[in-house]
Curated annotation (Swiss-Prot):
Lineage: Bacteria, Bacillati, Bacillota, Bacilli, Bacillales
Source species: Bacillus mycoides (strain KBAB4) (Bacillus weihenstephanensis)
Entry EC number(s): 1.1.1.25
Assembly behavior: Homodimer.
Protein name: Shikimate dehydrogenase (NADP(+))
GO molecular function: NADP binding; shikimate 3-dehydrogenase (NADP+) activity
Pathway participation: Metabolic intermediate biosynthesis; chorismate biosynthesis; chorismate from D-erythrose 4-phosphate and phosphoenolpyruvate: step 4/7
Keywords: Amino-acid biosynthesis, Aromatic amino acid biosynthesis, NADP, Oxidoreductase
Gene this chain is encoded by: aroE
Length: 277
């Protein structure tokens, strides 16, 4: 019988997940299909019940349901609970189990372009929202010891850090302080929406003086090269946009659902083609 997978959110028409996952199913000769489901906030509980009753094998969760869905699941993985959000649900042994592959997907994407182990790096996160939180706890989970957070409102960065693991050395910084000290970091990760289309002329951090070999990553993928990435490239940095994070988090969800590892390069090429790259 054909296995059913999907994604729930609102809006959902723009989602690239169906194209990416259905191509992977076809490429691996799997009898499965992935659909996008528009779910209103007030209907979330009923939608989750319905998906479970239909025997869905797994599904992704996107805006605005990543936090609210947690109360409707049977189990939540420890890292997802720490992050406080779920983006992937596995239907296993009659239970809906929530995971968060956003942060781990980003970590895998980052590892793919870093010559050295991430555990040896000093990292700066820009922003203190949901994406930053997922990345922060996932970096800590793989053993990164030095992670600072810069945010427009420093108190929000402090709140994020307050839940950190004891073995992580973290500081909450103003954006001005981060700009002054940017040369101290091996990796800078931009997690806000600043610089996203159509406001492409903006950047949360003016890149001025990076150390040699710095990696600058931006979770935005529209445009492919944001202002912060363009400025970093001019400084000789290694740059990475948000396509890698999107692909790696999707590939990890696919692996959790099916036990099969999809072709990352194929997924990335497909997504870039869909985005016009």
């Amino acid at each position: 019988m054909k296995q059913l997978y999907g994604v729930i959110g609102n809006p959902i028409g723009h989602s690239l997940s169906p194209v990416m996952h259905n191509d992977a199913f076809e490429h691996l000769n799997m009898d499965a299909h992935y659909l996008a489901f528009l779910v209103e906030e007030e209907a979330l509980g009923e939608a989750v019940k319905g998906l479970k009753a239909l025997g869905i094998s797994g599904f992704n969760v996107t805006t605005p349901h990543k936090v609210a869905i947690m109360e409707y699941l049977d189990e939540i993985a420890p890292l997802a609970r720490q992050i406080g959000a779920v983006n992937t649900v596995v239907h296993r042994d009659g239970k809906l189990i929530g995971y968060n592959t956003d942060g781990i997907g980003f970590v895998r994407a980052l590892q793919s372009i870093s010559e050295d182990p991430l555990q040896e790096k000093r990292i700066l996160l820009i922003g203190a929202g949901g994406a930053s939180r997922a990345i922060y706890f996932s970096l800590a989970d793989v053993g990164v010891k030095e992670i600072d957070i810069a945010n427009r409102t420093r108190d929000k960065a402090k709140n994020l850090i307050s839940g950190c693991m004891e073995n992580v050395n973290s500081h909450a910084l103003s954006l001005e302080c981060a700009a002054e000290n940017q040369g101290e970091y091996d990796i800078i990760i931009q997690t806000t929406t600043i610089g996203m289309h159509p406001h492409v002329e903006y950047t949360p951090l003016e890149i001025r003086s990076l150390k040699q070999g710095t990696i600058v990553s931006d979770i935005i993928y529209n445009p492919f090269e944001t202002k912060i990435l363009g400025d970093a490239k001019e400084q000789g940095a290694i740059i990475q946009n948000g396509i890698d994070m999107f692909v790696y988090q999707g590939a990890l969800a696919f692996e959790m659902w099916t036990g099969c590892v999809p072709n990352i390069d194929r997924m990335k090429q497909l997504v870039m083609r869909e985005l016009g790259g």
